[in-house]
């Protein structure tokens, strides 16, 4: 165990984390030249295309230090950098003793750098700052060193200058890992205690768990027990990734590896759970386990009603690999049958949609995303959790109060754009908690904001207001009471449930106006008149009329009597009236997206 080092790399999106991981693996000769490719640890196509890491990976590398003349076993645990997956980051850090904090030499410290840094500090990890991309023309390592000192309180002289792309400073990083990060503590003879920090589904092995062994050892044939559910399985394979899956005879205390135990469902092996042996169980679980709670909900509907079963199969198969997604069937009078799905955040939702269409060839209509509201009814003592605005009664007199989820948003921006950012945050009902300067050019703002205001276009607005320089991260705070009303959209007096949503009272009129105008543009004209109305309860607060397409029925009258023309026009009017009574308006997907734009 003296020669084992467990570490992870934490960084803001796009600071070069996956490239650095590739260089470390290459330097230690863990792969041949033939197997080289960019982003080796990003296994999904979508991760490569977007250049983001979604799934965690854990790689075992053997490193021979020429300076110390010693052999080391390094376990690199790669973490996703995106805010939606922050729970996964905290679990992977719990499996390590140290972390490389990667900072882009031209961008400097950004919001997720700070968020992930504090997560590492909470786990008492040894942090090695690495200033990456020093080969860029815009690199300014001295400014970054000052930021490291002032913002993070670390010794700037300990920062390593590197360029993962050019391979500069790689050996220095490896030496720092072996010298500064302590070896893992643990007792091989104690009862087994192992932390699951990731899992995925393999068609041949079943669900595979990536684990860090804290105490004891694990080999094929052992009967394991999971702490949170009490379920038991027999281990069929243990091993490590060297980036390829390699079988090993045993995993001992301090090791990081994978186990397979013919587990049928990924939901049985939850990230953060503790594994122990049935015959000799450990007394206490590793602290910090919680089930990932979906924060954002949206309806997924197949474009063709006949594809409903295919969508169900696709969601079932997909959720085997992604334990964070939840789904339940729901029916909408406007769109038909579909599913109400819960996601960790907006990026997670986009990824699920993209992977459904890519891996299962299914096109879906997505309704506007919403959050989980809590409401207290006057005639009931309990508090209801509501995932869709359709579950909220139209009669607001029955409701005592509504609570919505709030988050603490951290924004780091160049000082020139502070005014723009403050305006956006105030428009989104933000309450300023903190405002400080990190250095002469960079400001940090903290706002308490409703999650509903963030999930639609907040990220895009902040990026465009700061020419792409501002970065943003958020964490869940809790629920607060809000003055919300339900905005119902009616088309020819028929409420369309998929277009209704909750909105703050002060913004109701503005949003209703924007939405009916948007719908007027997107709904195609029919042969009869269409009325689009927005209502709060029984009060109509905005309406638009889409005129009918009409044939010129008086074209055949040459001159002649006015009463003849009037008769033809009256007849046409009667026909249109009848059509309006029985005609159905079909809504295009753009109509649902216009709800987003109005929000």
From Swiss-Prot:
Cell membrane keyword on record: yes
GO molecular function: GTP binding; GTPase activity; ribosome binding; translation elongation factor activity
Entry binding sites for GTP: 14-19, 132-135
Pfam family membership, one: GTP_EFTU_D2
InterPro entries given in the database record: EF-4, EFG_III/V, EFG_V-like, EFTu-like_2, G_TR_CS, LepA_C_sf, LepA_CTD, LepA_IV
The keyword Nucleus belongs to this UniProt entry's keyword annotation: no
Enzyme Commission number, as recorded: 3.6.5.n1
Protein's cellular compartments: Cell inner membrane
Residues of the tr-type G domain: 2-185
UniProt keywords, alphabetically: Cell inner membrane, Cell membrane, GTP-binding, Hydrolase, Membrane, Nucleotide-binding, Protein biosynthesis
Membrane topology: Peripheral membrane protein
SMART domains: EFG_C
Catalytic function, reaction form: GTP + H2O = GDP + phosphate + H(+)
Function noted in UniProt: Required for accurate and efficient protein synthesis under certain stress conditions. May act as a fidelity factor of the translation reaction, by catalyzing a one-codon backward translocation of tRNAs on improperly translocated ribosomes. Back-translocation proceeds from a post-translocation (POST) complex to a pre-translocation (PRE) complex, thus giving elongation factor G a second chance to translocate the tRNAs correctly. Binds to ribosomes in a GTP-dependent manner.
HAMAP family named among the record's database cross-references: LepA
UniProt family annotation: Belongs to the TRAFAC class translation factor GTPase superfamily. Classic translation factor GTPase family. LepA subfamily.
Name the record gives this protein: Elongation factor 4
Organism: Hydrogenobaculum sp. (strain Y04AAS1)
Lineage: Bacteria, Pseudomonadati, Aquificota, Aquificia, Aquificales
């Amino acid at each position: 165990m003296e020669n084992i080092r467990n570490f992870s790399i934490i960084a803001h999106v796009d600071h070069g984390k996956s490239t650095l991981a590739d260089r470390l693996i290459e330097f230690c000769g863990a792969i041949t030249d033939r197997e080289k490719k960019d982003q080796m640890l990003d296994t999904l196509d979508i991760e490569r295309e977007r250049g983001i890491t979604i799934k965690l990976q854990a790689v075992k590398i053997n490193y021979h230090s020429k300076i110390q003349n010693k052999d080391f076993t390094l376990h690199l645990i790669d973490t996703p950098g995106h805010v939606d997956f922050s729970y996964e980051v905290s679990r992977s850090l719990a499996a390590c003793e140290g972390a490389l904090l990667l900072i882009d030499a031209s961008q400097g410290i950004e919001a997720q750098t700070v968020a992930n840094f504090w997560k590492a500090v909470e786990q008492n990890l040894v942090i090695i700052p690495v200033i990456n991309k020093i080969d860029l023309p815009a690199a300014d390592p001295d400014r970054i060193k000052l930021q490291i000192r002032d913002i993070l309180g670390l010794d700037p002289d300990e920062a390593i200058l590197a360029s993962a792309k050019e391979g500069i400073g790689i050996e220095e990083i490896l030496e720092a890992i072996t010298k500064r990060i302590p070896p893992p503590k643990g007792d091989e003879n104690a009862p087994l205690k192992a932390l699951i920090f990731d899992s995925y589904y393999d068609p041949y092995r079943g669900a595979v768990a990536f684990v860090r062994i804290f105490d004891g050892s694990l080999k094929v044939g052992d009967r394991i027990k999971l702490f949170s559910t009490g379920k038991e399985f027999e281990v069929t394979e243990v091993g490590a990734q060297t980036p390829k899956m390699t079988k090993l005879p045993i995993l001992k205390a301090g090791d990081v590896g994978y186990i397979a135990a013919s587990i049928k469902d990924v939901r049985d092996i939850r990230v953060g759970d503790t594994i122990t042996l049935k015959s000799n169980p450990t007394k206490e679980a590793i602290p910090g386990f919680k089930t990932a709670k979906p924060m954002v909900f949206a309806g997924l509907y197949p474009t063709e009603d006949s594809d409903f079963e295919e969508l169900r199969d696709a969601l079932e198969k997909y959720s085997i690999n992604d334990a964070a997604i939840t789904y339940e069937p729901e029916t909408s009078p406007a769109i038909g049958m579909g599913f109400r799905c819960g996601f960790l955040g907006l990026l997670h939702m986009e990824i699920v949609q993209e992977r459904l269409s890519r891996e299962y060839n299914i096109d879906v209509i997505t309704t506007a995303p919403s959050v989980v509201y809590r409401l207290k009814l006057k005639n009931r003592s309990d508090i209801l959790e509501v995932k869709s605005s359709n579950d909220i009664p139209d009669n607001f007199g029955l409701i005592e109060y509504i609570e919505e989820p709030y988050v603490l948003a951290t924004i780091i921006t160049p000082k020139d754009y502070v005014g723009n950012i403050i305006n956006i945050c105030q428009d989104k009902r933000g309450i300023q908690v903190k405002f400080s300067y990190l250095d002469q050019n960079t400001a940090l703002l903290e706002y308490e904001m409703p999650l509903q205001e963030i999930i639609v276009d907040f990220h895009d607005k902040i990026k465009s207001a700061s020419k792409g320089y501002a970065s943003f991260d958020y964490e869940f705070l809790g629920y607060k009471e809000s003055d919300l009303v339900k905005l119902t959209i009616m088309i020819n007096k028929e409420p369309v449930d998929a277009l209704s949503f909750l909105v703050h009272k002060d913004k109701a009129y503005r949003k209703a106006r924007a939405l009916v105008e948007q719908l007027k543009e997107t709904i195609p004209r029919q042969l009869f008149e269409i009325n689009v109305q927005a209502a709060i309860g029984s009060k109509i607060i905005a309406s638009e009329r889409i005129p009918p397409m009409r044939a010129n029925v008086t074209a055949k009258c040459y001159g002649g009597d006015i009463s003849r023309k009037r008769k033809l026009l009256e007849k046409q009017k009667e026909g249109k009236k009848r059509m309006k009574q029985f005609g159905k308006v079909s809504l295009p997907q753009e109509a649902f997206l216009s709800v987003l734009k109005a929000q």
